[in-house]
Design a protein with these regions (language model features):
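Bacterial signal peptide processing site
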Residues: 9-12
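Propeptide-to-catalytic entry region of secreted or membrane-anchored zinc metalloproteases
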Residues: 17-173, 310, 314-315, 321
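C-terminal motif of bacterial Sec signal peptides marking the signal peptidase cleavage site
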Residues: 4-7
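Soluble non-cytosolic domains of exported or imported proteins
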Residues: 96-104, 218-222, 226, 280, ...
Length: 321
């Protein structure tokens, strides 16, 4: 999730070591990304045995898909195009994001997931060998739904996703990626549901309107990367630090790091976990750095995302529209 609620980071002035203080070391800005996706996920898993079962099945299916890829059993079946419904909840003119800004956000998603973003050339040479390139996922705007509201703030309780609580009901969540834009969410930039929630009434992505799209968005999160990050969660990516000190994001080619990074770190940035010092991939879309400092997915992340939109994947329903 991108509100980056548990926003934390490290910079290269004071390199991070396992077990060190996790207070973010801010580089370049006082405003930090906040994403609550993983916190919300863990709460949902704790309260639902059905979701826990789906989660386990998805992870097992992902592992099989990864092994089949390694064995050459998975052939390219072309790019998957995901239809998107943008649900705009607004109180003020600035919160009523324009059609042009929505188109701009869809364009950012398409560039970032195709690996054609203009800043892809900034990927350091040490990570060139594991960059995702084209994830083979595209996004097509299917509809925009707008609704005026008197609410001055929103939280992560999913009220924006139900008409009965002042929001907008999702459009066929099994078959469409629903994105809700809302006004103020405090320190949260956005959040998303993971594939085990596929088809549920609350399935989709939420983004605070100041961080949606580019034109008129708030710096340093004004390049549309909040959506890139949150859609990554929607497609089964975890935060790159595994939401724990030297945690596991279930991706083999992303270096283990002590915690999240924020601001605009200078490369190289080193962390030490289990006594091993590594240069970390802070420019990954699943970290917490500023929009201008993130510009890549890894090949391992690509495989995880492809597994959920495959014909046997948890989000295969997105393929039929």
């Amino acid at each position: 999730m991108l509100s980056f609620l548990s926003a934390c980071n490290s910079d290269n002035v004071s390199n991070q070591t396992e077990g060190s203080e996790n207070t973010p070391a801010i580089s370049g800005t006082a405003l930090q990304r906040g994403c609550a996706s993983e916190e919300i996920r863990q709460a949902a898993l704790k309260n639902s045995s059905e979701l826990r079962q789906k989660y386990s099945e998805i992870e097992a299916r992902t592992e099989r898909f990864e092994n089949d890829m390694k064995l050459g059993k998975v052939l390219s079946d072309g790019t998957v195009e995901i239809p998107v419904v943008v649900n705009v909840l607004y109180r003020t003119t600035s919160e009523n994001v324009s059609d042009a800004r929505i188109a701009e956000q869809i364009a950012v998603l398409n560039a970032d997931y195709a690996g054609t973003n203009t800043d892809v050339s900034k990927i350091p040479s040490e990570f060139q060998g594991v960059k995702a390139g084209d994830v083979k996922v595209r996004f097509r705007l299917a509809n925009v739904v707008r609704k005026s509201t008197t609410k001055t703030s929103w939280s992560t309780n999913d009220a924006m996703k139900k008409a009965s609580t002042g929001g907008i009901d999702a459009t066929s969540p099994s078959n469409y990626l629903n994105i809700w834009t809302v006004g103020n969410m405090g320190q949260i930039l956005g959040y998303a549901t993971f594939p085990e929630s596929s088809g549920l009434w609350n399935d989709g992505v939420v983004i605070a309107s100041p961080y949606f799209g580019k034109t008129g968005a708030s710096s340093p999160f004004n390049l549309g990367r909040t959506a890139t990050h949150e859609v990554g969660h929607y497609l089964n990516l975890r935060h790159i630090w595994g939401d724990a000190n030297c945690g596991n994001d279930l991706v083999a080619d992303t270096p283990t790091q002590t915690t999240s990074n924020a601001g605009k770190p200078s490369y190289p940035l080193y962390n030490t976990c289990s006594g091993v010092q590594r240069s970390v991939m802070f420019m990954n879309y699943m970290d917490y750095v500023d929009d201008a400092a993130m510009f890549m997915f890894s090949a391992g992340q690509k495989t995880r995302m492809q597994s959920v939109v495959a014909s046997s994947g948890a989000r295969s329903g997105l393929r039929i529209n």
